[in-house]
Amino acid sequence: MNSKPIPNDQFRDAMNELVNGWFKKWRDRQGMTDADWDTCISELTELGHKYNYKLVLAIGAALVEEIERRQDGGN
């Protein structure tokens, strides 16, 4: 895990992939199966490894919580 601040260009790229790619793909999916969740988390893990900064992982975790709330009908 990289403990240095994330460079602006990498932060911008990470946010684009997290929000406009990964989150957009999963945010409105209803009735996710265990296989869906496995794929969702696996994709997020890959992004976490790609960027390897605590901030990216924390934002990813927050987005997973949002997807969980939406699954519970909280949107």
Q: What does each model-identified segment do?
A:
Residues 1-33:
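N-terminal acidic leader/helix
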